[in-house]
Amino acid sequence: MSKKIGIEQSLSDVEAALKEKGYEVVTMKTEDDAKGCDCCVVTGLDTDMLGISDTMTGASVIQATGLTADEICQQVEQKLQ
């Protein structure tokens, strides 16, 4: 079963990279979208607005600011090991 990764709308390059690696990717518009995700990738701009945190979702949250799509994929893989 593939792992479900939630990402913010603005991270389309990350979405493409994660899908290429076989992950199920969902776009998060509200905190409810993050529920059921194994990992969430956020830009930091909307973190508080969306209410996405590892304590709330039970998923690892990766801060994407300043990282390339490849670096984010590496972090996702590390968090899901």
From Swiss-Prot:
Leader sequence segment: none
UniProt cross-references to Pfam families, sorted A to Z: UPF0180
UniProt xrefs under InterPro entries: UPF0180
Similarity-based family: Belongs to the UPF0180 family.
Matching HAMAP family: UPF0180
Protein name: UPF0180 protein BLi01634/BL05144
Organism field: Bacillus licheniformis (strain ATCC 14580 / DSM 13 / JCM 2505 / CCUG 7422 / NBRC 12200 / NCIMB 9375 / NCTC 10341 / NRRL NRS-1264 / Gibson 46)
Origin organism lineage: Bacteria, Bacillati, Bacillota, Bacilli, Bacillales
